[in-house]
């Protein structure tokens, strides 16, 4: 979920060649393709690098895969690399466009790289899409899932449903299920603000809409996470407020967010909690080197934990 796109970030985007048809195995090399997942639908998938585990980058609500290939840093944080190429330097990495998400183009636009889906989507259905995509594209598992914001909910639910295919988790200022009780009576207003964040696409029937409340329930009822290493990265600076969120609601969100982050840390023992000091919600843009380091840490821990 992002409500502002820095001009420098937009200018950094480059066009990517789309390849249709049956994909080759994505065990190495750079690929960018529309993958048939069945039911007359395809999803855009981009992969790079080689090695194991395969890292899967999951974007926040309403966001295409673009943020993982961009940076918006300030000294002393280096300008490059972005998370996607930075992770590709030491292992295989993939990311994809969910239907109805916003591209970081100029001007911003809904992605045309994945088949549109109308109506509100459930978290289990989105996890099913992801699993079908990885299977159809023959992306080698198991996977280290990196989820930003709402992407963290996808990562958690995927790990619950597919523990045998999950190697580790990195949660980047992720939206966790504990945010609901932390916000209490203000939760419904927050979810409504997520549904209508004040973008030019709010009224578009193909704009991504998700049953966030049902997603929280699915995770709460999904049982424990598999015994894999986890890292949590959290912001220290305020959210960029959407025009549809009141100052009072934003203040309550800021007060509740650290409690929900700490709950994520408590989901698995010995989970490192990394504070991206000076960063807002978009840790992967402002602190790509910290995000990459967290991915490498969990990749190393997962390798050490293998029998």
Where are the model-predicted features located?
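N-terminal cap/lid segment of alpha/beta-hydrolase-fold proteins
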Residues: 26-42
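Conserved loop-alpha-helix segment in the C-terminal half of the alpha/beta-hydrolase fold
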Residues: 245-277
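Secretory targeting and sorting signals
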Residues: 1-23
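Flexible "cap/lid" loop of the alpha/beta hydrolase fold
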Residues: 170-208, 244
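Catalytic active-site module of serine/aspartate enzymes centered on a nucleophile-bearing elbow/loop
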Residues: 269-307
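Conserved HGGG/HGGXW glycine-rich cap/lid loop of the alpha/beta-hydrolase fold
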Residues: 37-41, 46-106
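Conserved acidic catalytic loop of the alpha/beta-hydrolase fold
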Residues: 124-142
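Conserved hydrolase catalytic core segment
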Residues: 137-178
């Amino acid at each position: 979920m992002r409500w502002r796109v820095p001009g420098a970030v937009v200018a950094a985007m480059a066009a990517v060649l789309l390849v249709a048809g049956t994909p080759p195995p994505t065990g190495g090399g750079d690929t960018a393709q529309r993958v048939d997942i069945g039911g007359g639908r395809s999803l855009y998938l981009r992969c790079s690098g080689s090695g194991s585990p395969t890292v899967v980058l999951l974007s926040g609500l309403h966001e295409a895969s673009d943020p993982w290939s961009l940076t918006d840093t300030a000294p002393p944080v280096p300008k490059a690399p972005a998370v996607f190429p930075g992770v590709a330097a030491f292992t295989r990495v993939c990311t994809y466009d969910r239907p109805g998400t916003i591209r970081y183009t100029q001007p911003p636009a809904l992605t045309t790289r994945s088949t549109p889906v109308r109506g509100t989507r459930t978290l289990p259905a989105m996890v099913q899409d992801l699993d079908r995509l990885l299977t159809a594209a023959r992306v080698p598992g198991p996977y280290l899932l990196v989820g930003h914001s709402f992407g963290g909910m996808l990562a958690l639910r995927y790990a619950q449903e597919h523990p045998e295919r999950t190697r580790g988790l990195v949660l980047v200022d992720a939206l966790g299920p504990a945010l609901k009780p932390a916000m209490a009576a203000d939760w419904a207003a927050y979810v409504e603000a997520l549904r209508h964040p004040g973008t030019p696409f709010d009224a578009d029937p193909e704009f991504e809409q998700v049953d966030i409340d049902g997603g929280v329930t699915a995770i709460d009822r999904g049982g424990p996470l598999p015994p894999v290493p986890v890292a949590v990265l959290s912001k220290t600076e305020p959210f960029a407020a959407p025009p549809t969120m009141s100052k009072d609601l934003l203040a309550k969100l800021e007060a509740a967010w650290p409690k929900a982050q700490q709950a994520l840390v408590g989901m698995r023992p010995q989970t490192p909690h990394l504070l991206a000091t000076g960063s807002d919600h978009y840790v992967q843009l402002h602190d790509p080197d910290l995000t990459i380091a967290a991915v490498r840490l969990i990749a190393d821990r997962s390798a050490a934990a293998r029998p």
